[in-house]
């Protein structure tokens, strides 16, 4: 498998990352282990999670995903075959959130315990924290890198101005810089990333590992009507917003390309992202071996210029699309 450099970190990652939000939430421990084994045994090495996964689920406190990954790492002996990414900053209860030095030091040790490892390959700021000076946050990350607890750092959900500020502060003070950005990006959600973040990442050599690569499943073609959406737990909020003129136009273009390439709409959606010059590795999740096989096969699909152009055109926003 052709690995890709993640920014200037020195890390080499597979062209697709497994999104660990499902572990301990919609996927139990046994199936999580099977999915992770299949992923790594197929040559993929990139796994992304966060300390907060899956705090939103009833009865969960956060850390469930990290604990399952950690147990798998210990039992499988495959730690040296994984580029392990996690995040810090989302609310974890009891006032624990943000990017203050004290909280980062506490949170990284908690993540290391749950992950049953002595280092995190990519430690990401899950959200921006305007209340903490950028130099304090980056300085703390520098301590963690020097201590061997973290290899590289990344940012998630940062605006272009704040990412620029962080890169400039790091350069000016000789501190570690964010080597990756984790933004929302897919065929349905293009404008925010492409307008300012994409050119910035290309110019500054920042890797991009975008989340919601399949728009919460919408780009698989599974949801084409209100009735379909009502069957999903996410339907009322996340997926329903995509079910409009533009969304249906995107699905039609995906269907056309899928037929041409003997692929699925979801595979085409992933392949379109992988063809973008700024994208290092989209993040996608699977809840079954069948879904995982489909995701992995998407990395072998190379769209030609005509297919990419058709998808580009179909996903352009117009004033009538919100209806």
Predicted feature locations:
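N-terminal binding-site loop/beta-alpha segment at the start of enzyme catalytic domains
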Residues: 1-81, 146
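Active-site mouth loops of central-metabolism enzymes
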Residues: 20-30, 91-102, 131-132
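Active-site beta-loop-alpha junctions enriched in small/polar residues
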Residues: 21-23, 52, 87-91, 125-128, ...
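Short, acidic/polar
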Residues: 27-39, 99-114, 163-168
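A short acidic, helix-capping loop that chelates divalent metal ions and anchors anionic groups
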Residues: 53-58, 91-96, 219, 294
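Active-site groove signature of glycoside hydrolases
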Residues: 112-131
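Beta/alpha (TIM)-barrel catalytic core signal, keyed to glycine-rich beta->alpha loops juxtaposed to Asp/Glu
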Residues: 132-318
């Amino acid at each position: 498998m052709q690995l890709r450099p993640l920014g200037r970190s020195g890390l080499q990652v597979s062209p697709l990352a497994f999104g660990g939000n499902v572990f301990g939430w919609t996927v139990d421990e046994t199936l999580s282990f099977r999915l992770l084994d299949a992923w790594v045994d197929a040559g993929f090495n990139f796994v992304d999670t966060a300390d907060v996964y899956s705090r939103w689920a009833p009865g969960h406190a956060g850390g469930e995903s990290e604990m399952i990954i950690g147990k798998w790492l210990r039992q499988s002996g495959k730690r040296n075959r994984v580029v392990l990414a996690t995040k810090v900053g989302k609310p974890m209860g009891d006032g624990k959130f943000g990017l203050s030095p004290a909280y980062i030091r506490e949170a990284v040790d908690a993540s290391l315990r749950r992950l049953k490892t002595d280092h995190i390959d990519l430690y990401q700021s899950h959200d921006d924290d305007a209340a903490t000076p950028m130099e304090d946050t980056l300085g703390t990350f520098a301590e963690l890198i020097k201590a061997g607890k973290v290899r590289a750092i990344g940012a998630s959900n940062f605006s272009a101005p704040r990412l620029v500020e962080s890169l400039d502060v790091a350069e000016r003070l000789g501190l570690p810089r964010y080597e990756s950005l984790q933004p929302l990006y897919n065929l349905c959600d293009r404008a925010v990333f492409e307008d300012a973040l994409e050119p910035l990442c290309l110019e500054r050599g920042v890797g991009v590992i975008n989340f919601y690569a399949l728009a919460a499943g919408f780009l698989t073609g599974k949801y084409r009507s209100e009735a379909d959406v009502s069957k999903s737990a996410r339907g009322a909020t996340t997926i329903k917003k995509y079910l409009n003129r533009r969304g249906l136009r995107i699905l039609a273009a995906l269907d056309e390309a899928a037929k041409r390439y003997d692929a699925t709409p979801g595979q085409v959606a992933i392949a379109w992202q992988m063809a973008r010059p700024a994208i290092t590795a989209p993040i996608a999740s699977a809840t079954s071996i069948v879904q995982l096989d489909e995701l992995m096969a998407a990395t072998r699909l190379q769209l030609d210029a005509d297919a990419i152009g058709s998808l580009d055109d179909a996903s352009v926003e117009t004033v009538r699309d919100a209806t």
